[in-house]
């Protein structure tokens, strides 16, 4: 049980460390308008992730362990995690450059920020694939435990994004993170590849 939690929670958090559209939207808004304005985006992103998590949980609970659909889900999750891990390993590194200029930049309200964050999360298909892959690791566990994992993931997304928004007000923090980003992406990629191998092994064992 502890091993499963560390594997799922670790993969989820490491994936958060690799910047995507949500990250840059939060950082730019925090730099231009402060972390309070950016917090609306953080809540919207968490809600969007929560929707994908709920769909992944509902889909998993509808599939019986050992069925052909269950095996297909495991293999699809394994292949996607392996692809994502390989992309991170071979990536030359994501460049973090945020323009701090405020000339002509509209000042979004908190509600507008929430809608922006929600749209950013929902329009990123990688979120749906990633959570479907993660929940394939939870196959066979009680539904109540799967739901707790979902609550945990939403909480971590919100907490991490709020931390990013608060830290983005300090350019030195952003620059320090950027210097270590390549190493973070490599560790994340290697971890996702190992998890993909584990999922594939489970799929073979269930044949």
Language-model-derived ranges and their functions:
Residues 66-96, 153, 160-161, 175-207:
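Selective transmembrane alpha-helices of multi-pass membrane proteins
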Residues 6, 10, 107-119:
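Alpha-helical membrane-protein architecture signal
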Residues 78, 120-132, 189-192:
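Core segments of transmembrane alpha-helices
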Residues 169-174:
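Short, flexible, glycine-rich and Lys/Arg-enriched loop motifs at helix boundaries
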Residues 2-71, 133-149, 153:
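Juxtamembrane transmembrane-helix termini in multi-pass membrane transport proteins
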Residues 22, 48, 52-59, 81-84, ...:
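Alpha-helical transmembrane segments and their lipid-water interface positions
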Residues 35-113, 197:
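Membrane helix-loop-helix hairpins that form the core translocation module of multi-pass transporters
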Residues 13, 17, 50, 86, ...:
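Hydrophobic/aromatic residues within the transmembrane alpha-helices of Major Facilitator Superfamily
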């Amino acid at each position: 049980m502890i091993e499963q939690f560390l594997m799922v929670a670790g993969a989820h958090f490491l994936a958060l460390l690799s910047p995507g559209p949500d990250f840059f939207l939060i950082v730019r808004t925090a730099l231009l308008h402060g972390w309070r304005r950016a917090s609306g985006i953080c809540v919207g992103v968490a809600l969007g992730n929560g929707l994908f998590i709920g769909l992944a949980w509902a889909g998993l609970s509808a599939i019986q362990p050992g069925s052909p659909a269950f095996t297909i889900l495991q293999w699809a999750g394994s292949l996607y995690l392996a692809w994502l891990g390989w992309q991170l390993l071979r990536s030359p590194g994501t460049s973090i450059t945020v323009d701090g200029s405020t000339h002509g930049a509209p000042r979004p309200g908190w509600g507008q920020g929430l809608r922006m964050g929600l749209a950013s999360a929902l329009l990123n298909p990688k979120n749906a694939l990633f959570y479907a892959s993660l929940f394939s690791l939870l196959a066979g566990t009680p539904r109540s435990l799967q739901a707790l994992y979902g609550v945990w993931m939403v909480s971590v997304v919100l907490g991490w994004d709020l931390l990013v928004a608060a830290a983005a007000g300090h350019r030195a923090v952003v620059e320090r993170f950027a210097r270590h980003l390549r190493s973070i992406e490599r560790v994340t990629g290697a971890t996702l590849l190992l998890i993909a191998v584990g999922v594939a092994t489970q799929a073979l064992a269930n044949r």
